[in-house]
Every structure is written in structure tokens, then in C-alpha cells.
């Protein structure tokens, strides 16, 4: 309280029960303080549980109270305390410090009364019961000489004091009565009445002061709160919380190009129902899962009082952009792609460089997918090689190989020269802008002509250094290991000229070389690190695939903890198989990776939707042109690696046919599953497995549903078989074969038969049931079938040139003399794509 604060007289509860005014407890001294205001004076009564003493102190008067009044109040209070002590002495109380507590209501009134009651201990109650013999006893208390002044002062204040003797255990009332006279002081007397003790009938509630009190009397007994009381108190607190509405927080909401209604509500910390209500006010019916555009979301957020920050959805990929510091750059190993025509010795060259037998493991002697290898030379320098397939079906994979390489080695067989895939590899390297090294292989074979190969290279603008060009042409033999050292020197020389550098610090980034699914290991992805250092436990995003790197192995199959730039590794831990050729990046957490993947999936979906109407227009055009009977060949393609599946799809979609539509229901990496069987059964599709097989359950389901499953290990065998299936679905070619001519010389009417033409076979042969064409004046007037063929009166199957015969047509009798009949047969021929 401040000195200027107005204080009103208030009642005070002293003791273990309820406290009506300021209450405090000092844990250090074990003392309880009760404060009350009398008149304009602050009175503090302190009971110490340690020393069992009672002290009274008076604070200064509020509002500049006169010091005289303060002294008078202090004197009055001391006199009242003296009466209490003397009453205790008369009750044979030898130790006043045992007064434990003051209970009930003690009202200090500024004009009249002072009432104080004390509680009794259990010992006092027992003593009281022994001494009570009458209901009321009047006791006269002798007042010593020094008490007259006290009684005179009490008379002036008209105070009546009630005191209870704690030792006897009886409630004693000291009634100080006097008759007021204006000019004299009357003699006062104190009447002490003994009143029958009333034991406390109600336990007191447990509170902090009761538990800390040293009162052992019966009146100090307490009771615990009932469950109902606790429940009522809790409900009351809940009602208070409900009534106190929380203050609304307005936020800055980041809104992308599209956002879900539920996501918008979460971003604003609003109820979904409130957001839907705002949308309804805008005339939009939506649910929590529906997606709305940024403009609508901005209106809703603004109406609800939030600030809006618009961002492009593509901004989620900004975290992938980082620049390397110049001082962090370090020299890295060159990445070399080996390309060329099939069977020209690319894998054998790598076999020689690695001193390992890779070619022996290739089915059909050709590379089926990209392989990445790291070769360490004798001087400690390293070269990373990427082996690409040479078959024509793997054009996309060769193109992808040139995009991640620093140097392209194009292998040309000395005995075979430039072929189709050789030219394609040259074009890929030129488009990628990478240096080219021509390796003329198989120079150990007899009857080779290296100059012829060089001349063929000139045609494609590949000019060697000896002819003044900038392309290094090195004759080698992978089988005999001839000039391999010169090839390595050429690679390192070009790499040194390019000054290849990358930063090994920071988050890793690179490109996906290949991906597959392996039973027991999950998704396996071969990647090439181009920047930073990839470590176990990193979160990466590759296209729409993401996950944590659980394990890394190098090209030798050894597990490693990290991979630096130009190091190819195989990782496992992605949630799905990524597309080969996509970039990968390390991000901070899985949520960031998921957001980027979802954004990319939405882009792919929008692109697919935009392409769909074109196909529909093409179908409508075909129907309008009358060619609506287009046959479909549904296929399900499963492969071991993504690059192989990509090559198969690319080759199949290139098969030309206007009558057969190849429909790829599903393509993926991994073994053939029961879901593939179910899809094939529902659509009557053929399942094609490339280097994969169906499981036991899938085989059982396929046999039951009679699904055609075909396995392949060489890609061109697969393509040839699909082409044959499509050819068998084509309508055959109907060819007309001329077999003879007949001249009608006379027409006869025969009963029950109709008109019969007497004819002469002028050329070839005429057969019964053959197709005929009737000409009159060299104009075709009828086409049909020959119904009757007779020689005299006998039915015959055929009549040759130079003989007469009788003929009749099916459902046609308009024949005349000198008409000419051409006889022919329709022959069907199987078409090929």
C-alpha cells in the first residue's frame, strides 16, 4: 500500500481459518502475518510458531495522520493486550506463550468493540470438562489499581471485550459495563460469565496455514476436500477460461501459386470451418482437401486479418542453388564417357583399363545399361569412366552420358569402320560440346585399313591432329593392350588443359547415372557426385524421388562413408526409383525434400494434362476419317534398371503403324508383381520382363488368369517379338489374282434355273465359285461369284482354255451375248511392319 492510499475500516479473520485481508507466510522465520486497518492506521499482529510470542506493531498513520492519534491508538492497543494477560492470570494460566492461535472473528472497530477469541488445545478441553458443574457461573474479577485507568479509557471508547480462557477450556466473557456520565467517571465492574463449551461441529478445510499451524487443539482439526468439491472447483476454473476469450494473433502468411484449404487454415492458425465460410462468402464451395489459387487464398487471408506474402511455387527449389567459392575449388578427376557402335570393343577397352573382366558378364556381348567405374593410374591420378550401350535402342542413354562427361572417347573398329551408332555418338558429343578422342580399336586383326577409317571420319568433320585438326586419333588394341598408355596420357592431357575443378565442401550435388530395384536391398541408385561431399545420412532429392542415404558402395562393391567430386557411388535409401539423368541435391531435412518432390509432381501432372487433349483430337480425327477400327496392343513393361526400361519404351514407340496403337499400361523397375498380373488381367495385356522374373505368387496368379508373360535378356529380341505381334494384328493384304477370261456366245432360259450363258474359255481357266467380273463394252457392270459351271449336262469344278461351258451368276441374270467375263481369285498376304 502507498502512503496516499485511502484505507477503509475492514474486518479481519485471525487464526487458522479464512483470512479476509492481506496474508503472508515467511518460510524462513515460520511466522504468519495478518494485517488489518483500524481507522487510518495499519495494525500488524504477528504470531511466531517458533518462539510462541505475540507482538503488536503500529505503522505510521496514513494520509499524514497526527502523531498524537498514533500514540493514542498504540496506547489503547497495549491496554487491551494487558487485559488479555490479566484474564489469563485469573484463569491460572502461568504460561501465556502457549496461546496458540486466535480464531474466529476479531473485529477491531474504530469506535466501539474489540472482540478476540482464542482456540483451545485438546488438553484444555479435557480440563474444561472436569471443571464444568454449572451451565452459568458468574465470576467477579478483581481489578488491580493500575487497571482503573484502563477501564476509564475503555469506557470512553465503549468497548466490550470477550476473552476465552485457553487453560480452563471454558468460554469466559468479561463484560465491562459502565454508565456514561458527562462530568464524572463511574465505577466499572467486570462480570465474568462461564459459558458451556461448544465443541467444534465442523472440520475446517485444509489450507496452507492450517497445515503449517502448531495448533493441536480439537478446534484446529481439518478435513480433506471431497472429490465433488474438487470437481466443482475445476469446473469453475474452466468456466473462467471459457469466458476469457484468447486474443487473436494475426500472422504473415506465405501463399504459393496453389494451396490447399486445409494448408491455408494451418498457415493462419484458423479453423478450417472459418476458411470454408470465407470461401462461401466469395461464392466458392470447397472442402478441406480442395486446392485454391493464390488470388483466392490472398482474399481469404486478408478478410481474416492476416498479412499475405506471395511467393512463386518454384521458389522451393531456390535452396538447391548455391555458388562455390573460388578459394574452395580443388582439382578433380576427369569423367570420360566411352561410346561407339555395338561390338566395337567399348567394354573390352574398359576391361583392359581396369584389368577386370567386365565383358564376360554382359549378356549377348553388349552393354545393357550404363556402368560407372573409377580407375586409379600408376602415378596416383584417377579417371572416372562411364560405359554407355552401343545398341541403337540406347540412344537416350548415350545422350545422357555425354551430358555428364568431360571427355568423350568414341571407339571405332578398324575392321568395321564408321557405323550408325558411331555417327550418333559423334553428334551427341558435338551437341554436348565435349572434347573427342577417337580410339581405333582391333588394330591387332589382319587386313585392317586405319587410313580408310580416318577418311570416313573426315566425312563427319572429325579431323585428326596429324591432318591439322584438333581431334586426337589413337590406334589401340583392347585385347592385346596396345597403346593404352597413350590413350591415358591423352585423357590426362585434355583434362589438364580444361583445368577441371570442383569444391569438395558444402552440400553434395550431381547426376543420377542409373537406378534399379533389388530384392532385399530396395532402391539402388548409381550417382556421380559433381560438387560437394556426399555422406551417409544425407537427405537427397532426385527428381520426384527423395530419401536418406542409408548406405554407399563404390564401383568395387566396398562400403564407403563419403564421396567427393567425380566419384561414382551406388546408394540405397530413396523412396522410389528416380529417372536416370536427373540431377540430385542434398537438402537440409526430409520436409524440404518432400516439398520439392510434390512441386515437381504437380508440374509433371499439369504437363500431362496439357498434352492429353492433343491425343483426344487425334482420336477424333481418326474416327471422322472412317478409320475408327484401330486395334490396340496393351503392354506392361518391367525391367531391371531404369535406363533399360527407357530404351525399350523409346524403341517400341518408334514402331510405325497407323492401324495398331501400342498402349503402355505400366512401366517400371523391379520384378513382376501380383499387381502387374491384376492389371494385365483387367486389360488383356501382355507382360514383358527384361532381366526380371515374376515371383511365385505372381506366377500362380498369372497361370490362373492365363496371362502371357514373356522374358527377355537382349533388347533387340524383345523389340523384334513385339513387332511380330503387332504385325500379326494387322489386317492382311487382299490381292486379286487373274486366272482366266470367258466369252458369252449364247444365252439360254432354263426352267427353275434361270438364264444360262453358253460360253467359251478364251484364256486361262475358270473355276466354280470363283470371283467374276462382267464387262460389257469394256465397262464393268457386275462383280460377284460364279454359281454354276457345267460341261454339257455335268457339273464340273473347272474348265480350261479352249473348251466350251455353261455358266450362271449368283443373284444376277442380266447377261447378253458378246459379254466378257473375267475370272479371278482373292489372295490374302500377311503384312509386316
UniProtKB/Swiss-Prot annotation:
It is found in: Cytoplasm. It comes from the Bacteria. CDD domains: IF2_eIF5B, IF2_mtIF2_II, mtIF2_IVc. Residues 387-390 are annotated as: G3. Keywords: Cytoplasm, GTP-binding, Initiation factor, Nucleotide-binding, Protein biosynthesis. Residues 477-479 are annotated as: G5. It holds the Pfam family GTP_EFTU_D2. Gene3D superfamilies: P-loop containing nucleotide triphosphate hydrolases (3.40.50.300), Translation factors (2.40.30.10), Translation initiation factor IF- 2, domain 3 (3.40.50.10050). Its main location: cytoplasm. GTP binds at residues 340-347, 387-391, 441-444. Residues 365-369 are annotated as: G2. Residues 331-501 form the tr-type G domain. Residues 340-347 are annotated as: G1. One of the essential components for the initiation of protein synthesis. Protects formylmethionyl-tRNA from spontaneous hydrolysis and promotes its binding to the 30S ribosomal subunits. Also involved in the hydrolysis of GTP during the formation of the 70S ribosomal complex. Belongs to the TRAFAC class translation factor GTPase superfamily. Classic translation factor GTPase family. IF-2 subfamily. This is Translation initiation factor IF-2. It comes from Rickettsia canadensis (strain McKiel).
Amino acid at each position: 500500500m502507498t502512503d496516499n492510499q485511502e484505507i477503509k475500516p475492514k474486518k479481519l479473520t485471525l487464526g487458522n481459518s479464512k483470512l479476509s485481508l492481506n496474508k503472508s507466510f515467511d518460510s524462513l522465520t515460520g511466522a504468519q502475518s495478518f494485517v488489518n486497518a483500524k481507522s487510518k492506521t495499519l495494525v500488524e499482529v504477528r504470531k511466531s510458531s517458533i518462539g510462541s510470542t505475540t507482538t503488536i506493531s503500529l505503522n505510521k498513520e496514513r494520509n499524514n495522520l497526527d502523531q498524537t492519534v498514533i500514540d493514542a491508538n498504540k496506547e489503547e492497543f497495549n491496554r487491551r493486550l494487558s487485559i488479555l494477560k490479566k484474564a489469563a492470570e485469573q484463569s491460572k494460566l502461568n504460561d501465556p506463550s502457549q496461546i496458540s492461535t486466535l480464531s474466529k472473528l476479531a473485529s477491531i472497530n474504530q469506535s466501539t468493540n474489540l472482540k478476540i477469541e482464542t482456540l483451545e488445545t485438546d488438553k484444555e478441553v479435557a480440563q474444561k470438562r472436569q471443571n464444568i458443574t454449572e451451565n452459568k457461573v458468574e465470576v467477579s474479577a478483581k481489578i488491580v489499581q493500575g487497571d482503573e485507568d484502563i477501564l476509564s479509557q475503555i469506557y470512553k471508547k465503549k468497548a466490550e471485550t470477550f476473552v476465552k480462557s485457553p487453560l480452563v477450556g471454558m468460554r469466559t466473557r468479561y463484560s465491562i459495563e459502565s454508565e456514561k456520565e458527562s462530568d464524572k467517571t463511574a465505577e466499572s465492574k467486570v462480570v465474568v460469565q462461564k459459558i458451556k463449551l461448544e465443541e467444534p461441529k465442523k472440520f475446517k478445510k485444509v489450507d496452507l496455514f492450517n497445515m503449517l499451524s502448531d495448533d493441536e487443539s480439537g478446534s484446529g482439526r481439518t478435513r480433506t476436500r471431497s472429490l465433488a468439491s474438487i470437481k466443482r472447483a475445476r469446473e469453475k476454473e474452466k468456466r473462467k477460461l471459457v469466458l476469457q476469450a484468447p486474443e487473436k494473433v494475426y500472422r504473415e502468411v506465405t501463399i504459393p501459386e496453389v494451396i490447399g484449404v486445409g494448408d491455408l487454415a494451418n498457415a493462419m492458425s484458423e479453423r478450417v470451418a472459418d476458411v470454408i465460410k470465407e470461401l462461401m462468402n466469395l461464392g466458392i464451395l470447397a472442402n478441406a482437401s480442395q486446392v485454391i489459387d493464390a488470388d483466392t487464398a490472398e482474399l481469404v487471408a486478408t478478410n481474416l486479418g492476416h498479412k499475405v506474402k506471395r511467393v512463386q511455387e518454384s521458389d522451393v527449389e531456390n535452396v538447391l542453388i548455391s555458388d562455390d567459392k573460388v578459394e574452395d575449388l580443388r582439382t578433380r578427376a576427369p569423367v570420360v564417357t566411352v561410346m561407339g557402335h555395338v561390338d566395337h570393343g567399348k567394354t573390352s577397352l574398359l576391361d583392359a583399363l581396369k584389368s577386370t573382366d567386365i565383358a564376360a558378364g554382359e549378356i549377348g556381348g553388349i552393354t545393357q545399361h550404363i556402368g560407372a567405374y573409377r580407375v586409379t593410374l600408376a602415378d596416383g591420378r584417377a579417371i572416372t569412366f562411364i560405359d554407355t550401350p552401343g545398341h541403337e535402342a540406347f540412344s537416350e542413354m548415350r545422350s545422357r552420358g555425354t551430358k555428364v562427361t568431360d571427355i568423350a572417347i568414341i571407339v571405332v573398329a578398324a575392321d568395321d569402320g564408321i557405323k550408325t551408332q558411331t555417327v550418333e555418338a559423334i553428334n551427341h558429343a558435338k551437341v554436348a560440346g565435349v572434347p573427342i578422342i577417337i580410339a581405333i580399336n582391333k588394330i591387332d586383326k589382319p587386313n585392317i585399313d586405319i587410313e580408310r577409317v580416318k577418311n570416313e571420319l573426315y566425312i563427319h568433320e572429325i579431323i585428326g591432329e596429324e591432318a591439322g585438326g584438333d581431334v586426337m586419333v589413337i590406334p589401340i588394341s583392347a585385347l592385346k593392350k596396345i597403346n593404352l598408355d597413350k590413350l591415358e596420357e591423352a585423357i590426362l592431357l585434355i583434362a589438364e588443359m580444361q583445368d577441371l575443378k570442383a569444391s569438395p565442401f558444402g552440400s553434395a550435388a550431381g547426376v543420377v547415372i542409373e537406378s534399379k530395384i533389388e530384392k532385399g536391398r530396395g532402391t539402388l541408385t548409381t550417382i556421380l557426385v559433381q560438387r560437394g561431399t556426399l555422406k551417409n545420412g544425407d537427405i537427397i532429392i532426385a527428381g520426384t524421388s527423395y530419401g536418406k542415404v542409408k548406405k554407399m558402395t563404390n564401383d568395387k562393391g566396398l562400403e564407403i562413408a563419403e564421396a567427393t567430386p567425380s566419384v561414382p557411388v551406388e546408394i540405397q535409401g530413396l523412396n522410389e526409383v528416380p529417372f536416370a539423368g536427373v540431377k540430385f541435391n542434398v537438402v537440409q531435412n526430409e520436409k524440404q525434400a518432400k516439398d520439392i518432390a510434390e512441386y515437381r509432381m504437380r508440374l509433371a501432372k499439369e504437363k500431362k494434362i496439357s498434352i492429353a487433349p492433343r491425343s483426344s483430337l487425334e482420336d477424333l480425327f481418326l474416327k471422322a476419317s472412317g478409320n475408327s477400327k484401330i486395334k490396340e496392343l496393351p503392354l506392361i513393361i518391367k525391367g531391371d534398371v531404369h535406363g533399360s526400361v527407357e530404351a525399350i519404351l523409346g524403341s517400341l514407340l518408334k514402331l510405325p503403324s497407323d492401324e495398331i496403337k501400342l498402349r503402355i499400361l505400366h512401366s517400371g523397375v523391379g520384378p513382376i508383381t501380383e499387381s502387374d498380373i491384376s492389371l494385365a488381367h483387367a486389360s488383356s495385356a501382355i507382360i514383358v520382363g527384361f532381366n526380371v522374373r515374376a515371383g511365385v505368387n505372381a506366377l500362380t496368379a498369372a497361370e490362373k488368369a492365363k496371362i502371357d508373360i514373356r522374358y527377355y535378356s537382349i533388347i533387340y529380341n524383345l523389340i523384334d517379338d513385339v513387332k511380330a505381334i503387332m504385325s500379326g494384328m494387322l489386317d492382311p493384304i487382299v490381292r486379286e489374282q487373274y486366272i482366266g477370261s470367258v466369252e458369252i456366245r449364247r444365252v439360254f432360259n432354263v426352267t427353275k434355273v434361270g438364264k444360262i450363258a453358253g460360253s467359251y474359255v478364251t484364256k486361262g481357266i475358270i473355276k466354280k465359285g470363283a470371283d467374276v467380273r462382267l464387262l460389257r463394252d469394256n465397262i464393268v457392270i457386275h462383280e460377284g461369284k460364279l454359281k454354276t459351271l457345267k460341261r454339257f449336262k455335268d457339273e464340273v469344278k473347272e474348265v480350261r482354255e479352249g473348251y466350251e461351258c455353261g455358266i450362271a451368276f449368283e443373284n444376277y441374270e442380266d447377261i447378253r451375248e458378246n459379254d466378257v467375263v473375267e475370272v479371278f481369285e482373292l489372295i490374302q498376304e500377311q503384312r509386316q511392319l
